[in-house]
Structures are given as structure tokens and as C-alpha cells.
Amino acid sequence: MDEECRNCPSLCETRTQVVHGYGDVGADFLFVGERPTTQADAVGVPFAGAGGRDGNGGLRRMLERLGLCDVTSPADAPALENAYLTNLTRCRDPDRRPTDDEIDTCEPYLNAEIRMINPEILVPVGERALTELGTEYTTTPADALVLPDDHATRIRGRGFELVPMIDPHEQTDEQTQTWLETFAQLMASDYRQTKGRQER
């Protein structure tokens, strides 16, 4: 992956570094956010410091509770098992969300990661990721894919099953617990049979 990408000139001026995907390259579960967090931009690991009511790593705690992240591993180098983390865009502007053009420009990187990882389950984290992944990998119209309605639901798609979540920093404790219970049930099921099904 290109560590010196210059495809989005304005983002090149605001980023600290290009933040590509991170985690287990043989993972079944691929988590996709919208853009790098502030801490991710600093350390180069997607979702670093993301979410939680205290702003201290809500997604990481969720992964730990599911057994997908070693509790003892450092924040800037989490030990992930069966999980891979990435974003729609690789660079951060601290003052705004990415434009549609910037997401389109980064799409080849995301597509390359999806092909490389070949996951069973895609986890869109946040509304933008749900819209982008849902449009690409399901037959559901984009305007029918919304959060919080689709939070912690299982959406069958073309080659992947999607399990959307609200951004961790926006989740209530109840929403977090609901998503964890749904995902734990999925992990205990024969989820690998979802490949190739073409439904909602």
C-alpha cells in the first residue's frame, strides 16, 4: 500500500500519515469506518482511541470482550485475532469529514484489502460506511440502509454478510450490549455459509 499517497492534495496537507488497514490478514471479520480517528492519524492504526463515552477506545473494548483483541496488547499495536480494521479513507482532515470524491479516490485501497482479506463478515462502523458497503455489497437501496435502525442486524449481501454498528462514541450502553450479543451469536453460528448468498 502507498505510504506517500498524494491523490487528495488537501488531505495531504492535514494528515500526519496515511493510515492503511491493520490486523489479522486471514480474518473473517473486517471492520470498516469512515476515516482515521485523531489517534489513528497519530499512531497509524485504524480506530485507535475510537469511541467509548470517555473517548478511550470503545471499539477496542468491544473487540476484547469478543476475544478478537488481546487485552494486554498496547494501544498503538493491538494484537488482533480474526479481525481486521480499516476505513473508507486513509487520511484525516481534523476539521471535516471526507468528501464523496475522497472516498471514491480511496476505494481501490479498500477493494484491495477486501480482496486480500477475503472476509466472511463486513462490519460497517457508522452511517457512511454502511451506505458505501451496503450499496456495493447488497441489493438493498442506499436509502433503506440507516442507523440506528440497522444497528446490530444481519444483512445478507453479495458474497458477504454485513453487521452494521453505530459509531462507538455515539452508542448507548444498551446499543453496545445489543451489538455484542448479536455478534457473539454470529460467531457461534456457522457464519461461513453466508458466502455467495445474494439476498438482502
Where are these regions (language model features)?
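A polyanion-binding, active-site-adjacent surface
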Residues: 1-200
